[in-house]
Amino acid sequence: MKIQKKLTGCSRLMLLCLSLELLLEAGAGNIHYSVPEETDKGSFVGNIAKDLGLQPQELADRGVRIVSRGRMPLFALNPRSGSLITARRIDREELCAQSMPCLVSFNILVEDKMKLFPVEVEIIDINDNTPQFQLEELEFQMNEITTPGTRISLPFGQDLDVGMNSLQSYQLSSNPHFSLDVQQGADGPQHPEMVLQSPLDREEEAVHHLILTASDGGEPVRSGTLRIYIQVVDANDNPPAFTQAQYHINVPENVPLGTQLLMVNATDPDEGANGEVTYSFHNVDHRVAQIFHLDSYTGEISNKEPLDFEEYKMYSMEVQAQDGAGLMAKAKVLIKVLDVNDNTPEVTITSVTTAVPENFPPGTIIALISVHDQDSGDNGCTTCFIPGNLPFKLEKLVDNYYRLVTERTLDRELISGYNITITAIDQGTPALSTETHISLLVTDINDNSPVFHQDSYSAYIPENNPRGASIFSVRAHDLDSNENAQITYSLIEDTIQGAPLSAYLSINSDTGVLYALRSFDYEQFRNLQLKVMARDSGDPPLSSNVSLSLFVLDQNDNPPEILYPALPTDDSTGVELAPRSAEPGYLVTKVVAVDRDSGQNAWLSYRLLKASEPGLFSVGLHTGEVRTARALLDRDALKQSLVVAVQDHGQPPLSATVTLTVAVADRIPDILADLGSLEPSAKPNDSDLTLYLVVAVAAVSCVFLAFVIVLLAHRLRRWHKSRLLQASGGSLTGMQSSHFVGVDGVRAFLQTYSHEVSLTADSRKSHLIFPQPNYADTLISQESCEKKDFLSAPQSLLEDKKEPFSQQAPPNTDWRFSQAQRPGTSGSQNGDDTGTWPNNQFDTEMLQAMILASASEAADGSSTLGGGAGTMGLSARYGPQFTLQHVPDYRQNVYIPGSNATLTNAAGKRDGKAPAGGNGNKKKSGKKEKK
């Protein structure tokens, strides 16, 4: 084997070697080798490593390989020796047919440099094929009158070899009538012709046997033979004649099968069988005979198989016309195949990278691509491109090779992968294209820091929270992937009130959930400022911080604290002064309280929980100011005890109470005289309170029983008197005065009333007059200190018992008692101001029974409730005895629940005031009652 060079001479050889080395370094030189055909597999072709300037061991390291297109590889690289060897047995006739020289072209790729080196290997022909004829025997007829010199074309032999190994000569067996003349054709092959040397005589010899031998020029010589049988017939003096000596037609390669391409025509002036012309192919290639069909009677030439411009661009054939007597004529037919764009470009990806990091610089090579189109001309010119919206570009190399490179830096967070469509299109009409897809994965690098969902966070936690309670959750996301996006959370250490932040809070490193490590106190601190850090797991790791404001929410965990009046250390109560001349609304004192909580939990409201004289004082709901609700009277006790409750608005509400002692006096000596009485009484123990409750319940039960008995007796008495009035028709001028007792739950005062009933014999109507009593106990609502007008009862109240009290008015809602004003011990009172007293009909009837019982006992002079003459009723049971001279005159109306009558005091009558009439509705008066 040797490398063939075009230049000769030592100097030229050296110059050529130097030029070859430079061309190889630039990747644009051609390397030429030659090898005989039919060489065994693995035969040496050339030292490719030496010609590339590389060492044999560098072939594998630098990725040197053969790049061939569209065929089985004929050659291979021996990585150990660095030589080019045959990959299989090579048949030159299979590769190149009759073409000379037979060149096999391919490229050597140096992958690390992405360089291509074109290589051409010439396949040298050897004499491995024998000349052959298409027919083993040839029979034809000749007229005996054929003139000498007539030429008869003989089939030519075919030898697949080329050069000297191809067919070189023809020989005809000896015969006195025939000789051989070989014509050199214009297109190359030799055409043997048999020449008639002397006239034929059928009677002398009817059949002539000849042998035509075709020999090549190889060593040793190979030859093939054709047996010829010539039958001598009678004379036919007119051979067929074609209308044209040569026929030419252009046919597109995509013509349908069976299309009539051409019609040849030959005529023979003879008659009968001598004038009948038949057509046949003469000396055509077997491939042409497979593609085209010639109708032997009509001369039509059609295609039996598709035409392929890429296989044959021109078909040349000879058509022979023969009459019935054996005379023949020949014509040449040329069929030129026109190329059409029927082949799409072929895209081959020679080398490709499937993954690239996102931080690789622009110009990174992704793939090496080759494009080929089997068409010719513009139909074979191709263009390769990719979509313009991709960060890639195609760079054209030599010999329709392209490389795909990055045009700019990739960003995985925007696009994590690309499906690159490579389109190859030719310039034919219509243009054909081919698409090839390359999938490229962009691998991630840690180039993004974690990002919190908010710029800052605010969290709220109620105080007194349990330890370990979940407070808040922060979340961050990382645009990276896999480990670069795995986030861990931590608190940036800080100091709060001398203690580390980790003593107060902790965070779950995986979920970002904050937990309280201690119970927070709103009164200690109200908010915490901290920073949370999110860090990914990349290399190197990236992090970001966010501010978190943790606000402690107040809970109602502090009761109100009363600042004034301050509790003395000796358990005594302070004394506030109120002159008896004070007008309603006079500011006695002010209860001052604070609450350590905040917001609604620190909103305070004040109310009078208990008072020794209900209705005398009022407390501002929001100010805590203690004011007089009415004018002070002489009968008001010097010492007034008030229990004020202060309550916040938390849930649940908390409260505190304070006891006030108010001294009512106009002069200082009055206060000094009774200074000893202002000492606070000792608190009864639980057993005394229980005893008082038992005694009170027993007393109420006895009074109720007495009330029932008295009520029955009263009803019987009224019924009896009404019968007497109806019978006698007389009149009653008066009735004995009765005594009524008003009960306020604290004291019972004996009150004497007189009333007069006037009746006539002819009329059942009468008028009942209620004069004012000596005094009346007054129950005033905390919400109002207004005086009420008196009520008068019409005679209808005294009518027959059979008439129902349908005109009875409901109790006036202005005379409702707060819970603090209801009868009972002080320990049974509560702060609910929504109820009314009496609560139900039972309580109302019980109170009426107590009043009637007390009145009956006073009228009979046998009352056991009083403490003696001039004393208050029930005083022996419920408290110390006081004379009537010490009891102040309230001059207020006393309303009996369940009745539409009002008891007026006697003072009104003494003052010359007539009782106001009414129908059960009270009239309000804003004027102060004069003494």
Swiss-Prot record:
An annotated Gene Ontology molecular function: calcium ion binding
GO cellular component: plasma membrane
Annotated membrane topology: Single-pass type I membrane protein
GO terms classed as biological process: cell adhesion; homophilic cell adhesion via plasma membrane adhesion molecules; nervous system development
Membrane-crossing residue ranges in chain numbering: 693-713
Superkingdom, taxonomy of origin: Eukaryota
This protein's UniProt keywords: Calcium, Cell adhesion, Cell membrane, Glycoprotein, Membrane, Repeat, Signal, Transmembrane, Transmembrane helix
Residues spanning the signal sequence: 1-28
Polar residues bias: start-end ranges: 805-840
Disordered: annotated span: 801-840, 901-931
Composition bias, Basic residues: 921-931
Domain Cadherin span(s) in chain numbering: 29-133, 134-242, 243-347, 348-452, 453-562, 570-682
Glycosites: N265, N419, N545, N685
Cited InterPro entries: Cadherin-like_dom, Cadherin-like_sf, Cadherin_C, Cadherin_CBD, Cadherin_CS, Cadherin_N, Protocadherin/Cadherin-CA
CDD domains listed in its UniProt record: Cadherin_repeat
Function comment: Potential calcium-dependent cell-adhesion protein. May be involved in the establishment and maintenance of specific neuronal connections in the brain.
Name of this protein: Protocadherin gamma-A1
Species: Pan troglodytes
